[in-house]
């Protein structure tokens, strides 16, 4: 069942993969859930790894990296440094916004790892003086992280470097 879920994810069928995953883990005990979370992490299914690890964490402490993985380290470090923002803030937002699914699309139309709205992406491209911006590139990992960190920087600048207001403003 977990293998079928992975096959759905590999085909880009996120909803089907999620249903298959939930069906596959429904009867697992805590030790089996932990193994499933580790398996998901090994196969880069971080959204499933995190959500399954949360179920395990209700019963006993877990390794930090199962609950809080750090994928895309090079890109996040580079763009967070460029924007002069805390890398942990970027990871926290990305974890919450997309669970690290690069192809994520919200019901309101936010896209990619950092869940950037199309109009916001166009505005960011203009601010960054990117003349040939194509909306579909927002799903590219590097572009999404670049735009997301630039947007966070602009929010901090407008909100007096208040990270709480900037975090709230990110989803406003």
Regions flagged by a language model, labelled:
Residues 1-4, 11-172:
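Catalytic glycan-binding domains that act on GlcNAc-containing polysaccharides
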